[in-house]
From Swiss-Prot:
Activity is regulated by phosphorylation at Ser-49 and Ser-52, which stabilizes the eIF2/GDP/eIF2B complex and prevents the eIF2B-mediated exchange of GDP for GTP, thereby preventing the formation of the 43S pre-initiation complex (43S PIC). This results in the global attenuation of 5' cap-dependent protein synthesis and concomitant translation of ISR-specific mRNAs that contain a short upstream open reading frame (uORF) in their 5' UTR, such as ATF4, ATF5, DDIT3/CHOP and PPP1R15A/GADD34. GO terms for molecular function: ribosome binding; RNA binding; translation initiation factor activity. It comes from the Eukaryota. GO terms for cellular component: cytoplasm; cytoplasmic stress granule; cytosol; eukaryotic 48S preinitiation complex; eukaryotic translation initiation factor 2 complex; mitochondrion. This is Eukaryotic translation initiation factor 2 subunit 1. Coiled coil: none annotated.
């Protein structure tokens, strides 16, 4: 059963000018033999002349066995099964789109393959039938192979009725919904940035407070921003969101507002860490750091109290 496999899309071969994801299997005199990952690993070839626009000095710098590459289809012979590919004709924009499509299609494939495992399918034909009755229905409906199924499955997390039109029995539907929810339910991410804000003028403390308050005002209902002091002049900014890209953008905007406000008062603004998604490990480390600083501050306060008491005793 581990051998179950199927192509990602309804058509068995890519079309000319399609940009596809391949894995390099071997390198020969004529070019590189590759497997088309979205088409059940059928073989294709990248001719040496199609590897680079420049003169090739070292083929290993351009392509390596085991590496995934984005390539464009330049010829397909469906009868003989020949597929000629080009790496040099793929633009950076096309490469990004290919990566996005492959990632989403692979997610759909993983969901359906796991459904097949749970339902104890034993043949590739059963998996292909599942694709025909689910993913390919949406790909065809929305005329967007790869994207149609992914978007429909994502929508099914909040509205499972989108699957009602599919030809599925009760078990298949239940297992499919469970797997869609497991893989596609949005996960909240925490985004963090570290900044330094200081102002050494007459009203420096008020200027810092005002600048930080302006940053906090960039919060939205779904994306509240928090600012905590690590140790003057360093602060940590955080927000939690389901939308990673939007979260990074909102935190960047808040930083820009703080910078503008503090510099109006001739203060100083430095970025210690650009906005990034943080892990539990990062959070644990920050908590430890802040705890240590609190202890140090408490010790300093204790020393001050002792000195004050000694001074009173002397008086």
């Amino acid at each position: 059963m581990p051998g179950l496999s199927c192509r990602f899309y309804q058509h068995k071969f890519p079309e000319v000018e399609d940009v596809v994801m391949v894995n390099v299997r071997s390198i020969a005199e004529m070019g590189a033999y590759v497997s088309l990952l979205e088409y059940n690993n059928i073989e294709g070839m990248i001719l040496l002349s199609e590897l680079s626009r420049r003169r090739i000095r070292s083929i290993n710098k351009l392509i390596r066995i085991g590496r995934n590459e984005r390539v464009v289809v330049i010829r397909v012979d469906k009868e003989k099964g020949y597929i000629d590919l080009s790496k040099r004709r793929v633009s950076p924009e096309e490469a990004i789109k290919c990566e996005d499509k492959f990632t989403k299609s692979k997610t759909v494939y993983s969901i359906l393959r796991h459904v097949a495992e749970v339902l104890e399918y034993t043949k590739d034909e059963q998996l292909e039938s599942l694709f025909q009755r689910t993913a390919w229905v949406f790909d065809d409906k929305y005329k967007r192979p790869g994207y149609g199924a992914y978007d429909a499955f994502k929508h099914a997390v909040s509205d499972p009725s989108i699957l009602d039109s599919l030809d599925l029995n009760e078990d298949e539907r239940e297992v499919l919904i469970n797997n869609i929810n497991r893989r596609l339910t949005p996960q909240a991410v925490k985004i963090r940035a570290d900044i330094e804000v200081a102002c050494y003028g007459y009203e420096g403390i008020d200027a810092v407070k005002e600048a930080l308050r302006a940053g906090l005002n960039c919060s939205t209902e779904n994306m509240p921003i928090k600012i905590n002091l690590i140790a003057p002049p360093r602060y940590v900014m955080t927000t939690t969101t389901l939308e990673r890209t939007e979260g990074l953008s909102v935190l960047s905007q808040a930083m820009a507002v703080i910078k503008e406000k503090i510099e109006e008062k001739r203060g100083v603004f430095n970025v210690q860490m650009e906005p990034k998604v943080v892990t539990d490990t990062d959070e644990t480390e920050l908590a430890r750091q802040m705890e240590r600083l609190e202890r140090e501050n408490a010790e300093v306060d204790g020393d001050d109290d002792a000195e004050e008491m000694e001074a009173k005793a002397e008086d």
